Amino acid sequence: MRVLTGLQPSGDLHIGNYFGAIKQMVDAQEKSQMFMFIANYHAMTSSQDGEKLKQNSLKAAAAFLSLGIDPQKSVFWLQSDVKEVMELYWILSQFTPMGLLERAHSYKDKVAKGLSASHGLFSYPVLMAADILLFDTRIVPVGKDQIQHVEIARDIALKVNNEWGEIFTLPEAKVNEEVAVVVGTDGAKMSKSYQNTIDIFSSEKTLKKQISSIVTDSTALEDPKDHENCNIFKIAKLFLDESGQKELQIRYEKGGEGYGHFKMYLNELVNAYFKEAREKYNELLEKPSHLKEILDFGAIKARKIAQEKMQKIYEKIGL
């Protein structure tokens, strides 16, 4: 079963990225054909700073690898190294009704938050469809906010298949319901756009500051606390097994500890969990040529599949 996901190189990764998508991909490497790419074309919808995009792409590659993506088990590449995706993007555009894109929630949300209402942003779901359909993807792990984009890809695939025959595999979105939306420090969905993240590869000083900023209620230190509605607990449970969650719940219900104590505990959890990944990340960033070699290795495998797919499409469309 082929599984594909992409992540924009738009800055430092946070724990929402990890628990919402990356961990699922790492865990699935033993069972499925994993295809993972750094979505630098998609990143251009929010920034056209070339040097920044290049550096962020290398940082994203180092992050993926340090968090457990194995280039021997997964196909791992830079989106722009497989040009066929842009060809397919244009072809799929001819099968995409304007109304389908006008209903996209993500476009409206991003424009409302200040992003330029460009054609690239508007047609973002078509490029995402090209990413997915080019590789005959069966499963696309996504957060709840991206389900609609996978549905759009499926709608486009159905339209093409009705015209040309069964040329595209119909993709399905897969959402891990337990961690699909990781809360940020303010209780909203964790997102760089909201500036409420806990970054994986930040310094210990920055990490402590981010965790200290988690919004809590005003329950007194000595009183029992509501763990179910506490942002600290919601984040901490991601790092704990069932037994650990139960122990933390008991501490909340017992009282005698303030939110400052729980923030210190969360800080320890995050530092311990990502210790090895941080060390590997820093080592990889010191070897950009090695990172490029790994991405090139994946791009060769991805291009071979993409070229074979495009040849079938050329025959259908008369190119």
Predicted features by range, described:
Residues R2-A130, N282:
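N-terminal Rossmann-like or analogous alpha/beta NTP/dinucleotide-binding catalytic cores
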Residues D49-G50, I139-G143, E222:
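Short, polar/flexible loop-turn hinges at active-site or ligand-entry regions and domain interfaces
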Residues V75-L78, P141, T219:
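Short catalytic-loop micro-motif centered on adjacent basic/acidic residues
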Residues M98-E102, L134-P141, L240-L248, R278:
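Short helix-capping/linker segments at secondary-structure and domain boundaries
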Residues S106-V160, W164, V183:
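Internal, conserved structured core segments that host functional sites
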Residues Q148, R154-L319:
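Conserved nucleotide- and phosphate/pyrophosphate-binding catalytic cores
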